[in-house]
């Protein structure tokens, strides 16, 4: 399983890919990618990291993760 630092890095990389499409698409695209392609254990671990303050997460990535909690 990936460490929280590795997951933060991966999530931020995904977010940076979508950032050029504008803030709303950055959030939506990042959320959709994580929802579709991340293993449930990875999602649980990044959510634990978010609960602990989410250090290192890009604001758009943080918003994407928060949006997934509302689903």
Predicted regions and their residues:
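N-terminal acidic leader/helix
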Residues: 1-23
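N-terminal intrinsically disordered, cationic/polar leader segments
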Residues: 5-8, 28, 59, 70
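Amphipathic, hydrophobic secondary-structure cores in small proteins
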Residues: 15, 21-51
């Amino acid at each position: 399983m990936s460490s929280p630092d590795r997951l933060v890095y991966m999530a931020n990389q995904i977010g940076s890919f979508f950032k050029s499409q504008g803030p709303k698409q950055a959030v939506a695209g990042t959320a959709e990618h994580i929802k579709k392609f991340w293993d449930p254990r990875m999602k649980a671990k990044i959510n634990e990291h978010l609960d602990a303050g989410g250090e290192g997460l890009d604001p758009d990535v943080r918003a994407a993760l928060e949006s997934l909690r509302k689903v």
